[in-house]
Design a protein with these regions (language model features):
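Bacterial Sec-dependent N-terminal signal peptides
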Residues: 1-30, 838-839
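A general lysine-centric signal
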Residues: 2, 129, 351, 923-924
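C-terminal outer-membrane/trafficking sorting elements
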Residues: 6-7, 842-851, 855-930
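Compositionally biased non-globular segments, especially hydrophobic aliphatic-rich helices
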Residues: 7, 15-16, 236-239, 707, ...
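Alpha-helical and His/Cys-centered functional microenvironments
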Residues: 7, 11-14, 92, 226, ...
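Generic detector of low-complexity/intrinsically disordered segments
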Residues: 7-12, 16, 244, 356, ...
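Beta-propeller blade termini and top-face loops
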Residues: 24-833
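Low-complexity, Pro/Thr/Ser/Gly/Ala-rich linker/spacer regions in secreted
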Residues: 831-845
Length: 930
């Protein structure tokens, strides 16, 4: 798992450049779960990917600024016919999941009036709602807004429970636009719902006035609570203090703190309306001031200090919990910012008796099991305050659940130490093996890195947990060991770094590298969301689905070869049951030589060949499928960039074969691009084809080659405030900037560019090429490149929105496009009827014809060679909802389409083979509507 492990406000150094307001590299090693580990320089590498080379820093407030700019860019119709300008190749977009794997979740709440209704907030995935106890989820955020959610609160008063609030902005962020390492994820204020979470509007007086600077109290909303006695809305804003609204959020007044003071703040309210607040001593500039714990008995009009004498003088983040059954009992969990000599964090825990005004320091009783720090987190490790959660059982003020990486419980409020010989009396989630030797290292059906714990309001044994993989439920919090259920079905907030499509037309397989959720394998069945399978652990990186083997990798370049388990190559060897064959060259054993998300390339014309960069040199393996591929690596010392450069991206051609493009980046000098002919055999002949005038210090993030013309390529530079998109049509002899309207307008910057794809299509009877660019504000495309006058239009706005499109890949054999987003899972786009891939694709779905297509009032589904006939047919819309269904006990079915809205639908049918086995197929159907 990737994490920035130190507090935000320490000063970091990037090759001698002092960068205020950024993380410094951690003194901790990364957790060593199944090879998890982060190279010490990983934070600097990823920071360099997005920083503005002119300032050496990521621009302040860049998330809000780029979203504001992207909101004014043109959009393509999502799933509709209608071209904006010229021969645009429209795609039918939909989310494919994974349906069963979530992502980082900061906020979770249960509806007090209907406990089957839950609202969840993902760090980069928006607000989601479930009305069936977490069995299924629906996105309720506008897809075009900032999807970073940090807190959710309901008005608990009778007659007001339909009113909800959520806040945005992570000051200790894991934001996808810089992969969470360096810069703060500026929020866009507080949002309110008056229809029980169905729709949301921003509260105008909380919107930051300047999206490019820290000028507003609501840039970083940490916690919202609503008084059950008065309805006043209280907000703990990081870097400022505690605010109150007495008019439902229309106006807010500062009660405690000041702008740029108290970097971390929290607030809690009891059932009787008593307020507790805690403010850090740490300030925004890294210095310290007076912080502590405060109490108000008059709805925030006045506050008294109740800081215990044993509370640390200097402290970073603290969180509060008040016992629901005894409002005079409260607890405070604190990360001080200090590290002990043994490498463990200094975490404090206090019990407060609000009735007597006394407090007890119970820090020494927190879990501290023997074992390595990072195998499972045997103590309360918060990752530098990134992961902290705490709650009190509703019927027992002494039953406390708290966690950092791992989740723990105590039945006496940690008045006594946990029983060392009875691990599962205390350990209830996250990791399960304190020795670090158990390969099943995660607690069953649970996940590490805790962000929220919520008890059922009327069933005190039932508890919900939100963490880095989504949402989990236990029905009996007292059971030993605890039994969890994963409730992330359809909660599509996975954070992908990488996406891959196998080359064959109609292949339904997809592969993605996901942060904290490994390499995920999916099969798209054409309707609804696909189930995902984690075939490799850690932070998933690059991968490939080949003819004979599958390949996956985790952070720092640790690539693996995996067997297929069936003749159809639809089942892949799992890391949980098999020892995977390592394939990376010897340098991969040293994470200091590898990038955090490290690229490799398998030659599309010969899957025996893998290209693997190491710093400024290249390795090649020509017998990747040998019994021991590690014996067949060659270091190509003459295929090298100058000292100080590192190869950051590479891609191999499809036609003509064996042309390799490599991109190299430098901290201060302009990036370099190289081309190598006969890359499968050559050890010489590297040709520099760099972009003239490229910005010094710019980071080459991606290279895309035309699949049928290796002389046409696109270079993607990912830094902010530079020209970052170039094209060549002559093999790199000349480059033309094509960023066009993605560049920004002088007042607002354009988005960071992440990846590109070139997709040749035949559309409406004449050739066209679709160019796609993934950005930090969504996916864009054009069929008309015109240098810096190019007009890029946003794809899939109504489904993908402005999610971070980390990687886009295209398949010319059938025109399919896949996009791995950082926070909204995986999307696929397929050509609408009339648009087919450049390579020939049969217009039948396995012996069945669907006609006419497009259709208006009706369509027929006809079996070409019926054996036992059709069984049933369903029609789904682009978001996977069942629209209509038909029984079809024969070889032909008439589908009544009357009254349907125009658009693209998925027609899915089940049929019975001669053996009696029922199988399923699917095909797109364009309905023209009335």
């Amino acid at each position: 798992m990737k994490h920035a492990l130190l507090p935000l406000l320490l000063i970091a150094t990037l090759e001698g450049v002092v960068t205020p307001g950024c993380h410094q590299p951690s003194p901790f090693p990364e957790k060593e779960e199944d090879g998890h580990g982060m190279a010490p320089q990983a934070e600097d590498e990823l920071f360099a990917t997005y920083r503005d080379p002119a300032t050496g820093d990521i621009p302040a407030g860049i998330r809000a600024a780029e979203m504001a700019y992207a909101g004014g860019l043109p959009r393509k119709g999502d799933g509709r016919i209608g071209l904006r300008s010229g021969p645009a190749a429209l795609l039918d977009w939909r989310s494919v999941g994974p349906s069963n794997i979530g992502g980082r979740t900061r906020a979770l709440a249960i509806d007090l009036t209907d406990t089957l209704t839950l609202l969840a907030g993902a760090a980069t995935g928006g607000i989601w709602k479930s009305t069936d106890g977490g069995e299924n989820w629906q996105l309720k955020s506008d897809p075009g807004i900032n999807l970073a959610v940090t807190t959710i609160a309901q008005d608990p008063r009778p007659g007001h429970t339909h009113i909800w609030y959520y806040g945005s902005g992570e000051i200790r962020g894991e934001s996808g636009w810089d992969r969470g390492y360096r810069s703060r994820n500026y929020g866009t204020g507080i949002y309110r719902s008056t229809d029980n979470g169905e729709s949301w509007e921003v509260l105008p007086n909380t919107v930051p006035g300047n999206p490019t600077s820290w000028d507003d109290a609501f840039d970083f909303v940490h916690r919202i609570v609503v008084s059950p006695t008065t309805g006043s809305v209280f907000v703990a804003n990081n870097a400022t203090g505690i605010y109150r609204s007495t008019d439902g959020g229309e106006n807010f007044a500062l009660l405690l703190g000041a702008v740029a003071q108290h970097l971390y703040n929290d607030i809690a309210v009891s059932s009787e309306g008593v307020l507790l607040a805690v403010q850090s001593s740490l300030r925004i500039d890294g210095t310290h001031t007076t912080g502590g714990i405060y109490r108000s008995d008059n709805d925030g009009d006045s506050w008294s200090t109740i800081t215990p004498g044993t509370f640390p003088n200097q402290h970073h983040r603290s969180i509060l919990a008040i016992a629901p059954s005894d409002p005079e009992i409260a607890y405070v969990l604190t990360y001080t910012g200090s590290i002990f000599a043994n490498g463990r964090e200094d975490v404090r825990f206090h019990k407060l008796d609000l009735g007597s005004g006394t407090a007890e320091d119970r820090s020494s009783n927190l879990p501290d099991f023997p074992g390595t720090n990072w195998a499972v987190g045997p103590s309360v490790i918060t990752l530098g305050n990134y992961a902290m959660a705490m709650a009190v059982k509703p019927d027992d003020p002494d039953f406390v659940v708290l966690g950092g990486i791992t989740l723990f419980r105590s039945t006496d409020g940690f008045a006594s130490p946990p029983p060392v010989l009875d691990l599962y009396a205390t350990l209830i989630g996250g990791y399960q093996d304190v020795s670090g030797t158990n390969f099943a290292y995660k607690y069953e059906n649970h996940w590490p890195d805790q962000h929220a714990v919520v008890f059922h309001p009327s069933n005190p044994g039932k508890m919900w947990s939100a963490n880095d993989s989504g949402i989990h439920l236990t029905w009996d919090v007292e059971r030993k060991p605890l039994v969890w259920e994963d409730r992330s079905n359809g909660y599509n907030v996975t954070q992908f770094f990488f996406a891959h499509l196998p080359p064959g037309a109609g292949d339904d397989r997809l592969l993605g590298g996901a942060q904290d959720n490994g390499t995920i394998y999916l099969r798209d069945q054409g309707a609804g969301y696909a189930m995902g399978e984690e075939i490799c652990s850690g932070d998933g990186s690059y991968g490939y689905l080949g003819e004979n083997y599958a390949y996956s990798s985790l952070q720092n370049g640790r690539a693996r070869r995996q067997n297929y388990l069936d003749a159809e190559h639809t089942q892949i060897q799992s890391f949980l049951t098999f020892a995977l064959a390592p394939v990376a060259p010897p340098p991969a054993a040293d994470p200091n030589l590898m990038f955090y998300i490290h690229p490799f390339e398998i030659d599309p014309n010969d899957e025996q060949i893998m290209y693997f960069p190491e710093g400024n040199v290249l390795w090649r393996n020509n017998q990747l499928e040998a019994a021991n591929p590690l014996n067949h690596w060659s270091k190509l010392n003459n295929i090298a960039a100058p000292a100080g450069y590192q190869f950051t991206t590479l891609t191999a051609s499809q036609e003509p074969a064996h042309v390799l493009y490599l991109g190299a980046s430098h901290n201060s000098l302009p990036p370099k691009i190289y081309r190598l002919e006969n890359a499968h055999t050559s050890g010489f002949g590297l040709q520099e084809i760099s972009i003239p005038g490229a910005t010094g210090g710019a980071y080459l993030h991606d290279l895309a080659i035309h699949p049928f013309d290796a002389d046409e390529a696109i270079a993607v530079l990912s830094n902010y405030n530079i020209t970052g998109l170039y094209r060549t049509t002559d093999g790199g002899q000349n480059w033309t900037p094509i960023e066009g309207n993605l560049l920004g307008n002088g007042q607002l910057p354009g988005p960071s560019l992440r990846s590109a794809a070139i997709l040749p299509l035949t559309q409406f009877g004449y050739p066209a090429t679709l160019y796609l660019v993934g950005t930090s504000a969504g996916l864009f495309s054009t069929v008309e490149l015109d240098g810096m006058n190019t007009v890029w239009e946003q794809e899939a706005y109504e489904t993908m929105g402005s999610a971070i499109a980390e990687m886009v890949v295209a398949r010319p054999s059938d025109g399919r496009v896949a996009v791995g987003t950082f926070g909204r899972s995986m999307f696929v786009g397929d050509p609408l009827p009339g648009i087919v891939g450049n390579q020939e694709v049969e217009d039948k779905a396995g012996g069945y014809s669907l006609f006419p297509n497009p259709a208006r009032d009706y369509a027929f589904l006809q079996a070409e060679n019926p054996v036992a006939g059709l069984v049933a047919i369903q029609l789904y819309d682009t978001v996977g909802r069942l629209i209509r269904s038909w029984n079809a006990p024969n070889e032909q079915a008439l589908l009544d389409l009357g009254g349907l809205a125009g658009g693209v639908y998925s027609c899915v049918w089940q049929y019975r083979e001669g053996s009696g086995q029922i199988k399923q197929k699917a095909k797109k159907l364009l309905v023209l509507g009335d």
